Curated annotation (Swiss-Prot):
ATP binds at G146, G148, K149, T150. Residues 74-99 are annotated as: Domain II. It holds the Pfam family DnaA_N. Belongs to the DnaA family. GO terms for biological process: DNA replication initiation; regulation of DNA replication. It comes from Campylobacter jejuni subsp. jejuni serotype O:2 (strain ATCC 700819 / NCTC 11168). This is Chromosomal replication initiator protein DnaA. Domain I is involved in oligomerization and binding regulators, domain II is flexibile and of varying length in different bacteria, domain III forms the AAA+ region, while domain IV binds dsDNA. Residues 317-440 are annotated as: Domain IV, binds dsDNA. Its main location: cytoplasm. One of its GO terms (cellular component) is cytoplasm. Keywords: ATP-binding, Cytoplasm, DNA replication, DNA-binding, Lipid-binding, Nucleotide-binding.
Length: 440
């Protein structure tokens, strides 16, 4: 049996939208395939990883059932050479699909914490339970940039596609450009058909719709049409509806008519979990020291954190060396916020001692009393995260024999953080106090 035919036959097992968005993009690679190995090319690395994980076993099973032969399925990103052979029609198709959902943005890959669990719960509920759509409609998710709003929005889209629903995802910019283009071409009917006749409408950064009254009027009618047809609407924004500038009151009223859920900056434990999830997805192995350093040193923008992880892996691969804490510090030095340059270890020591009611001289001594040892380790941990001091410099500050003693203390406090939720919260609180003080 021709392996390409397997994909065609799989159409019967999947919804039309699911097949068109994912498996229809695969091309059988006959040159690299063997009797027991079937290789398929996906348009990019992201799509390849997603299809391999989600559909690899299904394709293998389907092939075995229909052909009687077993084979390993390998989904890979097509090479640059193969990409260059794309026709103009292919390129036009890619441009037309510029708002396609990111297949890696799923509920399973979203890390849930106190900062986002309400928004996550609401979105997951309506994605899997149609009856809740009438109650939770629209859903309005707001919060600062880079905290996972787009991930959550597209997770709803991907789950809805699997259920065979017609999904439209667009940023406000996409929506405005789409409207403007169709208006110039005299094809507004096409625009209306696209946006009004969908089961799920996902609008990212809805705050930017406030550019013209005409755009808002169009969105108002689309919004009403979808709701009247029992369609689901989910939007994201940087602020809640009542704080949106330039948006008409009637739109604000409709935005606020369903569920309003905020996403706030993640706590330390959630940031650590996010970093681990990103490492797992990108097949990158980082030590606990490095993970904790990234979590405590960077801000809350998840995209920035993922960028650092990928940069670390690139540095290590190109230079042919292991990813160490020192390499992480070197790579991250330009990303760490400038406000941290104002933080000294004396500031950290003073605050920690005040919190634990301990003398600074005791923390800097070699006393082994448990509360003093814990305070000392917290000072070292925060100094590693918030200052540019090296381990030898810290060893000199605490009058320790050498940097290995500092490394030992970092390892111990990291283990304590992982096993003690209250300690995690306390260190996060201390860190925030130090950062706030450095800005004053």
């Amino acid at each position: 049996m021709n392996p390409s035919q397997i994909l065609e036959n799989l159409k019967k097992e999947l919804s039309e939208n699911e097949y068109e968005n994912y498996l229809s993009n695969l091309k059988f690679n006959e040159k690299q395939s063997k009797a027991d190995l079937l290789v398929f090319n996906a348009p990019n690395e992201l799509m390849a990883k997603f299809i391999q994980t989600k559909y690899g076993k299904k394709i293998a099973h389907f092939y075995e059932v229909q052909s009687g032969n077993k084979a390993i399925i390998n989904i890979q990103a097509q090479s640059a050479k193969q990409s260059n052979k794309s026709t103009k029609i292919d390129i036009a198709h890619i441009k037309a699909q510029s708002t396609i959902l990111n297949p890696s943005f799923t509920f399973e890959s979203f890390v849930v914490g106190d900062s986002n669990k309400y928004a996550y719960g609401a979105c997951k509920a309506i994605a899997h339970k149609d009856k809740l759509g009438k109650l939770y409609n629209p859903i309005f998710v707001y919060g600062p940039t880079g905290l996972g709003k787009t991930h959550l929005l597209q997770a709803v889209g991907n789950a809805s596609l699997e259920m065979g629903k017609k999904v439209i995802y667009a940023t406000s910019e996409n929506f405005i450009n789409d409207f403007t283009s169709n208006l110039k071409n005299g094809s507004l009917d096409k625009f209306h058909e696209k946006y009004r006749n969908c089961d799920v409408l996902l609008i990212d950064d809805v705050q930017f719709l406030g550019k013209t009254d005409k755009i808002q009027e169009e969105f108002f009618f689309i919004f009403n049409e979808i709701k009247n047809n029992d369609g689901q609407i989910i939007m994201t924004s940087d602020n809640p509806p009542n704080m949106l500038k330039g948006i008409t009151e009637r739109l604000k009223s409709r935005f606020a008519h369903g569920i309003i859920a905020d996403i706030t900056p993640p706590q330390l434990d959630t940031k650590i979990a996010i970093i681990r999830k990103k490492c797992e997805f990108n097949d990158i192995n980082l030590s606990n020291d490095i993970i904790n350093y990234i979590a405590t040193s960077l801000g809350d923008n998840i995209r920035e954190i993922e960028g650092i992880i990928i940069s670390l892996n690139a540095y290590a691969t190109i230079l042919g060396q292991e990813i160490t804490l020192e390499l992480a510090k070197s790579v991250m030095k330009d990303h760490i916020k400038e406000k941290k340059e104002n933080i000294t270890i004396d500031d950290i020591l003073s605050l920690v001692c005040k919190e634990f009611n301990i003398k600074p001289s005791d923390v800097k001594s070699n006393k082994k009393t448990q509360n003093i040892v814990t305070a000392r380790r917290i000072v070292i941990y925060l100094a590693r995260a918030l200052t540019a001091l090296t381990m030898p410099q810290l060893a000199n500050y605490f009058e320790m024999k050498d940097h290995t003693a500092i490394s030992h203390n970092v390892k111990k406090i990291t283990e304590m953080i992982e096993n003690d939720a209250s300690l995690k919260a306390k260190i996060e609180e201390l860190k925030n106090k130090i950062l706030v003080k450095s800005q004053s």
